[in-house]
Swiss-Prot record:
The lineage of its organism: Bacteria, Pseudomonadati, Pseudomonadota, Gammaproteobacteria, Vibrionales. This is Sulfite reductase [NADPH] flavoprotein alpha-component. FAD binds at residues 339, 373, 403-406, 421-423, 427, 436-439, 616. GO terms for cellular component: cytosol. It catalyses: hydrogen sulfide + 3 NADP(+) + 3 H2O = sulfite + 3 NADPH + 4 H(+). Its EC number is 1.8.1.2.
Amino acid sequence: MSSQKKVSSGNTTPSGLAGLASPLNDQQINLLQQISDLSPQQLAWVSGYFWGLSQSAAPSAVTPIAQAVSAVAAKPAGKLTIIFASQTGNAKGVAEALEQEAKAEGIAVQLFDASDYKGKNLANETHVIIVASTNGEGEAPDNAIELHEFLQSKKAPKLPNLQYGVIGLGDSSYEFFCQTGKDFDSYLAKLGATPFIERVDCDVDYDASAAQWRKQALEKVKDALSAGVEADVVQLPVAQLAAGHALYTKQKPYAATLLTSQKITGRDSGKDVRHVEIDLAGSGITYQPGDALGVWFENSGELANQVLAKVGLSGVESVDVDGESLSIHSALVSKFEITSSNPQQVEKFAQLSGSKKLLKLVEEKDKLREYAGNTQLVDLLAEKQTKLTAEELVGLLRRLTPRLYSIASSQTEVDEEVHLTVGLVEYDVKGEKRFGGASGYLAQRLEEGEQVKVFVENNNNFKLPADDNVPVIMVGPGTGIAPFRSFIQERDNRGAEGKNWLFFGDRTFTQDFLYQVEWQKYLKSGLLTKLDVAFSRDQAEKVYVQQRILENAAQVWQWIQEGAYLYVCGDANRMAKDVHQAFVAVAEQEGKMSRGDAEEFINDLRKAKRYQRDVY
């Protein structure tokens, strides 16, 4: 692992040395001036460091520079260390908000990406907060795999002096809800650390619960972790502390313009996949290949009417949402999730309706999760006709959350645009069509020229290698092809010399070969070194991308030995697992390893960020 580094630091005015009686020579003063732009919190930390040196050394050994720094920042202070384990950026966003709020309270704080934090350093900490999302089936996010494993190992230090807090982010629709947060809580406790606040497990609509927990956590540590700078400490407002962060965020999205939503699957395809282009002109928004675009959407007004009819409401009834009075119809369209359900929602409605079917289902957790994952709200309400008040209906609902789409373009190619590859979620329930919320909005309801609220979600866990000479292997069936379109555009415009190999799969060659003309162009030019496709329904026996990887095992292994980076994007439940096992099989077969050693080899590639996944 590279040397530990901070993600960010505070912004404040430099502290001058004028007026200090200096025992330093000119060279030492010049050196000291290099710390003049540190924030009060950073100066407090430096002060503590030199104070520690002065306590461990004889009085005559105390250096003049330590004396000078102590004059600038009078006393040492404790600090709050925040570590985020994030896959898509949500945990990072919560951690950054916590960092800003801590600074506003005068608390010395430092923020780390989990991949940049050395676990052994926990022994030197006094107060740590871990913000953790969960990936796949209870797995740690890619950036936290090493820390997660370290804390379970025999190398992990005892932590009797550490106080900690954990906030988990997840989706209660899944079995392993907030599992990574639960893991970190358990591991730290077993190592002797003490929680200063109870862990919170936040659901999909986490903003309010996360904000409340952050406030409570800072109240508990504020007295112990004041900044410790007695003179000229300026308390900056949160808005100033956030300087340098993105102009547009989840909370403050940009009103972009839809340029086009074009179907790119064939007329006879069983899928409706759209190439979506959005205009960002004048916004100043930038993004990198591998990032995601957050899209805020509105629900279908027609679907809202169907929901209201199921519970006996007209739509004009008023409800209060964040202090704003809205009609229940408007609230369903713009404020709440109505194209999905979740286990808690099913349980609440079972109790309200008295449905025997649902009450029995609630007792069987696996079946409950499966039902909730495949049932829209309107179909849940149809299980038993039940009259509800507007407030009771709202009490069933989650807040609307934006959807994240892997960006399918590079700004080196498209400038002030962003492209997406959107698969329309579409299915029948008892003869009635059901559509996904965001995909239905982008593919059907939003007209060209209309505005759509968006923001960029950086994904540092899915990035091209910095060295343009490094080969890359990309596996992206279906709409998982999206980020690789951005990768290839980027490498093309950078003049990258590294080899590029794409594995793509879908149902049929004639109807579902997404961006076929572009891939053939890149293949002809030589930018795309190799293209292997798997169309599952073009022959009697289905073929998938993992089989193509195994068929090319010797060459895949050769590329890996040449330093190739591996990228996988798409379905997490089956495809990503099967592709992972294919890579393990390649290492076992071609590397002449045991199965266990092959697993370890592939996992080591992940830790080294040579094997990156964007799966969902």
